[in-house]
Regions:
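Conserved Class I S-adenosyl-L-methionine
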Residues: 33, 178, 183-267
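Class I SAM-dependent methyltransferase SAM/SAH-binding core
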Residues: 53, 59-103
Length: 267
């Protein structure tokens, strides 16, 4: 199962296109204004002099934005995606490395702040990853982990799962494990001296069918369909029909609850 999860995550992030679409949706279609990066910086008491590690950095925007804002401490990112590392490598002021969260290619006691945003639910052994985060943080350091609520955007996820199960003869392992807002505090409490939690609730709101379809197509791998699956076109056609019919009947908007937690662990 662990190998299957790792393979599903690797396939998902061979390209960053689906990730960028999901980020677009949360940035442009959240019901209430919200900036996760701002919240992470605030909850971690991040200072410009801090040495920062971002694990599972994805597009690298968090580190790029810190550098652009004049951050003076070291900025290091580790990701399992070769595409992500290649995209960030060479960016001024940022050290991008290929590596696993459960075996970080970094020395002990190296960072003031360790950040892991929206990635722990992609890891085969979350507890091992948390122990690694603690290992590379300094005395007095802080680790900030962000994960989604347990049943995020249930409307669109349920619809996509139904179509994947209907069209794909042998759905694969979803590219996520079972870590979420409700169980992360206990996982971190077993590793860190003290854990603080901030929950953020919101919704995704789509006013047009094309907006919802774009997002739905970007979460298919989270529902067991590989990005290169031959059934992908059939799934997208069915989703197009269902989404168009829903808007014809209801007029919109499509509103789906979502949320996340920021858990801060003190070393």
């Amino acid at each position: 199962m662990n190998d299957e999860l790792a393979e599903a995550v690797e396939a998902e992030y061979t390209s960053l296109s689906a990730l960028r679409i999901r980020m677009w949706a949360h940035r442009e279609h959240s019901e209430f204004p919200d900036d996760v990066e701002v919240n992470v910086r605030a909850e971690s008491d991040l200072l410009a002099r801090h040495d920062v590690l971002d694990v599972g950095f994805g597009t690298g925007d968090f580190l790029k934005n810190l550098h652009a804002a004049g951050h003076s401490g070291r900025l290091v990112g580790v990701d399992t995606s070769e595409s992500a590392v290649a995209d960030l490598r060479g960016h001024p002021g940022v050290d991008a490395r290929l590596g696993s969260a459960t075996d970080l290619p970094l020395p002990d006691d190296a960072f003031d702040r360790v950040c892991a945003r929206y990635m722990l639910y992609h890891v085969s052994d979350p507890s091992a990853a948390l122990r690694e985060f603690r290992r590379v943080s300094r005395d007095g350091g802080v680790t900030v982990v962000v994960v989604n609520h347990a049943d995020v955007v249930p409307g669109v996820m349920g619809m996509v799962r139904e179509e994947v199960e209907r069209h794909v003869a042998d759905p694969g392992v979803r590219a996520v494990n079972s870590v979420h807002s409700d169980n992360l505090p206990d996982l971190m409490g077993a590793v860190f001296r003290r854990v603080r939690v901030r929950r953020v609730d919101n919704s995704l709101v789509f006013h047009e069918p094309a907006q919802l379809l774009r997002f739905a197509g970007a979460v298919t791998s989270m529902c067991g369909m590989r990005p290169d699956a031959p059934e992908r076109d059939a799934v997208i056609r069915s989703l197009t029909t269902r989404i168009s019919s829903w808007f014809e009947r209801n007029g919109g908007p499509w509103r789906d609850p979502k949320g996340y937690s920021i858990c801060v662990g003190d070393r």
